[in-house]
Amino acid sequence: DFIPAEGRKPGGWNFEITSEEDLNARVIRSSSCTVSIPELDLEVNPGGNATGYVTNMEGLLNRFIKIVEMVMKDLDESEKENLKTLNHMLHRLQNAGLERDGLHVELLDPHGLSQILHPDAIDRDLTDEELARLPVGPDPAVFSK
């Protein structure tokens, strides 16, 4: 995981993808970070085996695309409404930065180790409500003598 030298407080980062250039924004996601795309009602929470990673917005969106495609493969023909919704999500994710409508990405990290490195990225404190509902990712290893 990525641990900065200075102490961090719980925080969130918001970023709107409005151009192709925005896809190059650097993303640092720690193992305790929840990533969401509110317009599409998509959210990835850290699990017990979560690891951190460094990528850019395009790489982050590609992770969501793979998940949506995987869910689509598991649907049968009787689930046409769900398939329509997933196709819409896929289209928005694949065309982020190319269309008029922006796409918001939000990082919520109770440990404060995640960041979006771009001049237009907005950092903020997490609300008490967010802190109460957010998972914190894997438990650190504890060693005894």
Q: In which residue ranges do the predicted regions lie?
A:
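N-terminal cysteine/histidine-rich coordination modules
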Residues: 1-2
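Long C-terminal interaction/binding lobes of large macromolecular proteins
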Residues: 6-145
